[in-house]
Amino acid sequence: MEIDSITRNFLKDKYGIVHSRKMADISYPSTGNDFYFQLEDKSFWFRHRNNFILEAVRRYPPKGEILDIGGGNGYVTRRLIDEGYPAVLLEPGLSGAYNGKVKRNLPHVICSTLQDLNLRDASVAAAGCFDVIEHIDNDAAFVTDVARILQPKGMLYLTLPAKQWLWSACDVYSGHFRRHDERSVANLLEEHFNIIYLTFFFGCLSLPLFLMKALPFRLGISKEKPNVLTHETEHGANGGIIVSLIKRILDKETSLIREGKSKTWGTTCLVIAKKKL
């Protein structure tokens, strides 16, 4: 991507990371990117989400580069590039942008919010927002801005935390404003996009998440902040029989996209939409 062809509002640092000239506040823990960088390559959750996203892109391919908006440490961006889909990391967190550029060797990294970068209209072929929109209070305005920068019939790939009844302390700590279902996604996108595929995944985690996270939060007995050791266990970073079983179950979910099928339960929602003309 030739950044100067789509915006003039940037500076470039010694690592080659592009920075916008100003930066808005974001609803995300300041240490979040470094926290998850320690887990991503070992986590069955991040692995399965990546596999799901990749199958979505394969089935509904873009017609150009994918702008990975709010892409954190570039975990998804790196996988897309490795699989032959050109992608650019757009991440407002300094540590995430650095991890993506220096540690994951991504060719194009922009440290900015979408709003602050002020991209030109219809300058982007496709966009991905993977667990991003829930961090934005005025998500309707954000979706409008994404539609503005996308080319006609440009593809939008989304993952979002699903089912408001799964709301827990993890959502609060992570800076989420909401979780989503079919209706809320449709209402959010209908003005600018046509939804061409929607499904839920991580189905086998729905009941455990409710019993271990959502229910204790509702009862007021779970307010602790997550730590690396806790997350290593929850993300299966240390392996084990149960983790292997979960991986097998989750791998079967990936066939849903290959077969064009969908399901109505799961802790995360995947959406593929196309910009309206």
Predicted features by range, described:
Residues 193-204:
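Conserved S-adenosyl-L-methionine
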